[in-house]
Amino acid sequence: YSICLLFILIASCSDTKKGTKEVGDSILNHADLNPLISKRLSFMLDYKLDSLNFPRSMKKDGSVLGVSSQDWTSGFFPGVFFKLYQITEQLVFLEKGKEWVAFMEKEKFDGETHDMGFKMYCSYGELFKITGAPEYKDILLTSAETLSKRFDPKVGSIRSWDFGEWQFPVIIDNMMNLELLFEATKLTGDSTYHQIAKTHAHTTMKNHFRNDFSSYHVVDYDKMTGEVLQLVTHQGINDSSVWSRGQAWGSMVS
């Protein structure tokens, strides 16, 4: 929880004149937070390196739920190390993040998921911001190209899932993957990626949101015509409910 609090405080800081390093220092030096944060950072650094055991969450018994690099959350752990390096300038965080992210390169070819932004931009994207290394740029561009192949111009969206009884399901979470496409256009000058992301966002704004601006979790489209078939919720209470995490994903529309 201390790590989460750290980054919430950083993200919510309203003083745009302060850089990440300055804001991070002010938090890390806070007397009430420092011992807790230090304990969590040590736990992260000591966590055993394992390509099949990226830490995702804590179980009820206090043990860590580990996942493979294929999981949609895999990029978060190395990404946090890169953010910590930006804040502290301590190389131990950069090097530890590199160790973990090396297991993820193969995911750039995973065309069976829409979670390329979650996985690859939150990890390699942050590493590229730090180093500017061409090999990381290439990984990002390959990831963006893989993601773009899930876009259907008839629907105007990037397909989310390949399972279930839906024809062409698009979930609100998918908004979080568009940043990878915008970055690909910045890096290449090819507007195709930007246009795909923009079209997907406009389609989401049109069909995912109710009159009160709450959102559906899943919109299922006719893959032949692009017409809306169903407005449903897969992870919320019911089809008319507001799934709070999904509502947060949808904030990326703006």
What are these regions (language model features)?
Residues 1-5:
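Sec-dependent signal peptide recognition
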Residues 9-12:
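C-terminal motif of bacterial Sec signal peptides marking the signal peptidase cleavage site
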Residues 19-254:
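Glycan-recognition and catalytic cores of secretory/periplasmic carbohydrate-active enzymes
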